[in-house]
């Protein structure tokens, strides 16, 4: 059994359901984030339990053939994606194996599986993003939650989102700072701006901007609107009111400040209208 602060060499032999690496040390499972199958690492134990332990890769002694350098600078801290450090082919292999294992373990059957179909697009494919807005030590952060926390990591130019979203977030940062807009403090439940919720219809190019606020109105919205009009495809600005102390992003009530309050996409020849509350597969 390993103990906290132990250090040893570890070979990563599998992945967890969340995409982290796992290896065995004297029969005990050791979970290590940001590792790839085939990595040989120097592992430092940060939490030890009877049946498993959580480690940190202090050094990659021998990198896996599947390992790549993450394109995103925030990958190690941001919880937005799990596989930025491995080749796309390895990611597909893992996902296919995960499905097959579920059929065998849970269903007790072993059907024949066709090869997984790869996507031609591995970046910029998501049509929706919900950005929490926070201040930490006076610094404004708009991005995604850090792994296993509600601390917000500034998203920068997230490679999973359309480039238009990055421009919109920069507009919001300037507008917030120039107009002293308060941002939500989750611990005490005060502050106005909670989330920025963006949607893009890829077939039409239309973009919806929704601000989620802990209040009843959005101050200086005219200035924000004029800046948003510089974004190609911007179609509508909606304010969603959520005054509950909750982790749920959207409240029930929406106010339409500009446009129709929805955007239109086309999927398999069918025209679809999308409001803030619409369910639509994100990728």
Where are these regions (language model features)?
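Accessory RNA-recognition modules of RNA-modification enzymes
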Residues: 2-282
């Amino acid at each position: 059994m390993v103990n906290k602060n132990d250090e040893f060499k570890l070979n990563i032999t599998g992945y967890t359901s969340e995409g982290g690496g796992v290896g065995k040390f004297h029969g005990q499972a050791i979970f290590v984030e940001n590792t790839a199958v085939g990595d040989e690492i120097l592992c430092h134990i940060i939490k030890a339990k009877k049946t498993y332990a959580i480690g940190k890769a202090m050094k990659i002694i021998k990198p896996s053939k599947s390992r790549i350098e993450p394109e995103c600078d925030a990958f190690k801290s941001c919880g937005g994606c799990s596989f930025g450090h491995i080749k796309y082919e390895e990611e597909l292999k893992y996902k296919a194996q995960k499905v097959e294992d579920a059929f065998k373990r849970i269903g007790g059957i072993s059907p024949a599986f066709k090869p997984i179909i790869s996507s031609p697009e591995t970046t910029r494919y998501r049509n929706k993003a919900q950005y929490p807005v926070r201040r930490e030590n006076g610094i404004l952060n708009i991005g995604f939650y850090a792994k296993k926390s509600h601390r917000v990591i500034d998203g920068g130019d997230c490679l999973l989102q359309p480039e238009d979203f990055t421009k919109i977030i920069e507009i919001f940062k300037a507008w917030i700072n120039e107009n002293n807009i308060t941002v939500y403090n989750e611990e005490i439940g005060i502050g106005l701006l909670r989330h920025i919720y963006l949607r893009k219809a890829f077939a039409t190019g239309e973009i919806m901007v929704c601000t989620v606020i802990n209040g009843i109105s959005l101050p200086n919205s005219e200035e924000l609107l004029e800046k948003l009009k510089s974004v190609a495809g911007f179609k509508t600005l909606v304010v969603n009111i959520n005054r509950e102390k909750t982790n749920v992003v959207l409240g029930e009530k929406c106010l339409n400040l500009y446009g129709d309050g929805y955007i239109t996409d086309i999927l398999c020849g069918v025209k679809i209208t999308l409001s803030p509350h619409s369910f639509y597969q994100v990728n």
